[in-house]
Amino acid sequence: MPSEYVPEATTVLVIGGGPAGSYASTLLAREGIDVVLLEAVKHPREHVGESMLPSMRHYLRFIDLESEYDARKFMHKPGAAFKFVHGQRECYTDFKILGPDRTTWNVFRAEADELMLRHAASQGVKIFEETRVESITFSESVDNSVSPESRPIAASWKNKSGQVGKISFNWLIDASGRQGIMSTKYMKNRIYREGLRNVAAYGYWKDVTVFEEGGPRSNAPWFECLTDREGWAWLIPLHNGTTSIGVVMHQDTSNRKKAEGPSGLEQHYLSQLKLAPGVQDLIGSKGSYVPGSVKSTADYSYHATEYSGDHYRIIGDAAAFVDPLFSSGVHVAMTGALSAASTILGSMKGQVTEVEAQAWHDAKIGICQTRFLLVVLSAYRQMQHVGNKALLDDVNASNFDAAFSLFRPIYQGEHDTSTSLTNEELSKMIEFTRNLFTPTTHQQYNEVKQRVGDLIALSGPVMPSDELDKVLDSDDSDAKAVLKRINSLKVLRNDTSPESFTSEAVNGYVVNLERGQLGLVRA
């Protein structure tokens, strides 16, 4: 049960009770750390973004929460279908090729997020809902601003009943969502990506047909480019019998279409769904829109110059948001949460200096969101999306190099020693990851696997095109298509499980992923 009174002091204060805040606070509490979590609203609360990635199951397993998610009978998600080029068959990502036990769920976020928050309470986190952080106090600061010499030491709060108070802390985790109190109010270092300044309109439907119902792909979400190539739509079946259907486009496109089209958000939403024939086929004659369910949300893509500072970490949407495409939000949130907890503990235990811990966290967040950013940009290029351009300013060069150094010989060439990120290099990497969306069948995959063996393993080396040509017959187009797709999937192979924290070194350190010993160790 939630605690009754906000204490005057704690070791770690967490702002925000979404997946990032709940997960980070749970990790720390299970390590014996005193944690207080302040959440502005009362759970359950509505939230869009129902489609999860395979890593979700493994993150939950680490905190002993996986079985509760299974018990809730959330919709099984075996993979995802993408229709980015009309006139061609859809591309399907089968999570089984990622390895055993890599399926996940489509969840009702209000229920799923509350499960995580209540689990945090059961692990010893002191949780106070409907309690908003109004301001943060810093040490060594005349005007209460962030400087290299200052660190956050206390937070002023106000709850729903009007009570106010102040809590001091040794460490701060900002998981306040898009509000991002540290980034936007104090550090002022949030950077928006103009090319992905998107908005979404979404609603809920009943009696919608399930994609390939009854087959191995049954219940997979469907993502589709609009026929005018000015946006895309999602369709995600949920376990409560409803289906989440949304449409995403650039803010400028949305403004223009609203001005030119039917008035009102609901009519705009319904009119844009007519540009998604695959969605219309699944809605069919039986599907019905739930009146009044349509909502709109800004899905602006952003990042920051840093995600940490002296005794604080920023995670989840408070740190960065890539794009609703590919459902990376909760994965990035939990990755950031594990990074925050591990680096705080590493600093506490003297395993690394606080400066080293900050650098590790900054790099981990940057690498994770940069990988998904490149996949998103590749998808928009595959859609030939009107008005969307990959801009060099949208990508942090150091994060790009850390995320894709393994792939540099593939997209740049073995003998290119340039160290600066260029538009050409960015474009080449986007082209490389476009192979993710090459339509291949399960039959093709199995047949190619029999012919090439371990070459198809996701854990194997990245193979340049000339190397593929050496081991494949020149006319073996199926094998080339499958292996090029597997090559591209390797971009995300370290984002399928928290176990990658133990093997993917950042600045010479990895995470000791054992309960009771969580922290950083030399690689």
UniProtKB/Swiss-Prot annotation:
Example GO biological process term? secondary metabolite biosynthetic process
Q: Does the keyword Oxidoreductase apply?
A: yes
What keywords sit in the KW lines?
FAD, Flavoprotein, Monooxygenase, Oxidoreductase
* Domain of life where this protein originates: Eukaryota
- Annotated positions binding chloride: S328, G329
Assigned EC number: 1.14.19.-
For molecular function, the Gene Ontology terms on record are: FAD binding; flavin-dependent halogenase activity; monooxygenase activity
Per its record, the protein catalyses: melleolide F + FADH2 + chloride + O2 = 6'-chloromelleolide F + FAD + 2 H2O + H(+)
Biotech exploitation of the protein? Melleolide sesquiterpene aryl esters are cytotoxic secondary products with anti-cancer potential. Armillaridin shows therapeutic and radiosensitizing effects on human esophageal cancer cells. Armillaridin induces autophagy-associated cell death in human chronic myelogenous leukemia as well as of hepatocellular carcinoma cells. Armillaridin can also inhibit the differentiation and activation of human macrophages and thus might have potential to be developed as a biological response modifier for inflammatory diseases.
* Binding site residues for FAD: G17, A20, E50, V330
Q: Which InterPro entries match?
A: FAD-bd, FAD/NAD-bd_sf, Flavin-dep_Halogenase_NPB
Oxidoreductase as a keyword?
yes
Additional record remark: Armillaria species are both devastating forest pathogens and some of the largest and oldest terrestrial organisms on Earth. They forage for hosts and achieve immense colony sizes via rhizomorphs, root-like multicellular structures of clonal dispersal.
Free-text function comment from the UniProt entry: Flavin-dependent halogenase involved in the biosynthesis of melleolides, a range of antifungal and phytotoxic polyketide derivatives composed of an orsellinic acid (OA) moiety esterified to various sesquiterpene alcohols. The halogenase catalyzes the transfer of a single chlorine atom to the melleolide backbone, resulting in a 6'-chloromelleolide product. The enzyme acts on free substrate and does not depend on carrier-protein-dependent acceptor molecules.
Task: Indicate the family of this protein.
Answer: Belongs to the flavin-dependent halogenase family.
- Protein name as annotated: Flavin-dependent halogenase armH5
What organism is this sequence from?
A: Armillaria mellea
What gene makes this protein?
armH5
